[in-house]
Amino acid sequence: MAEVVQSGPVEAQARHVVYCGVCTLPPEYCEFGGTAKKCEEWLKEKQPELYQRLHSEEAISANLSTLSISAQERAAKDAAKKEAKAALAEARDAERKAASKVQIKRVERNKRKHVTVIAGLEVYGLENKKVAKELGKKFATGSSVTRSAAGNEEITVQGDVSDDVQDWLLEVYGKEIPEANIEIIEDKKKKGSS
């Protein structure tokens, strides 16, 4: 008896897609985001063969030759507009970072109990939950992310560790946060009239 080999449907292979490290889109779509120049630099550094395929002179001239003259002019205007917008947003972000302060407050809870409250870290691109967890491990205290009355997130660390927190922030996140932008504030609770 002859054995019949059944050829069933061949399983499709998964396609490997490269995603941009700047805008998290596939490199073919980076031009539609606001960070086209940064994306192009990332692609040139990390994926040179894909960069050659997308941004070489031949590829650009081939794409432009399919467009009409008015469409080429429009594309050039749009690209210039997006580039100017991205540069303006970057300048605004840098200005905001330079003007903002990280406030470390020492707040009195009871007679001899204190908590340290850190506000303003999110401006520098730091995740409050992650920093709170690191602070809790570093100082062996409880730390949590809370909302202030103004609606901003702040990190509350149990204990009077304001000076140590400042030193730790400069040591660990010194690249992101300049020393001049960290200020320590001592806040005393007013005694209630009883």
Curated annotation (Swiss-Prot):
| Listed SUPFAM superfamilies | eIF1-like
Per UniProt, subcellular location reads as: Cytoplasm
Could you state one GO cellular component term attached to this entry? Answer: cytoplasm
Record keywords: Cytoplasm, Ribonucleoprotein, Ribosomal protein
- Using the UniProt record, give the first listed, main subcellular location: cytoplasm
Give every SUI1 domain span. 102-173
GO BP annotations listed: formation of translation preinitiation complex; nuclear-transcribed mRNA catabolic process, nonsense-mediated decay; ribosome disassembly; translation reinitiation
Molecular function GO labels: mRNA binding; translation initiation factor activity
Report which superkingdom the organism of origin falls in: Eukaryota
Q: Write down a Pfam family by its short name.
A: DENR_N
Quote the entry's note on domains.
The SUI1 domain may be involved in RNA binding.
The entry assigns this protein to a family as follows:
Belongs to the DENR family.
Tell me, how does this one assemble? Interacts with the 40S ribosomal subunit.
Q: What is this protein called?
A: Translation machinery-associated protein 22
Organism of derivation: Aspergillus oryzae (strain ATCC 42149 / RIB 40) (Yellow koji mold)
| Organism lineage string | Eukaryota, Fungi, Dikarya, Ascomycota, Pezizomycotina
Gene that encodes the chain: tma22
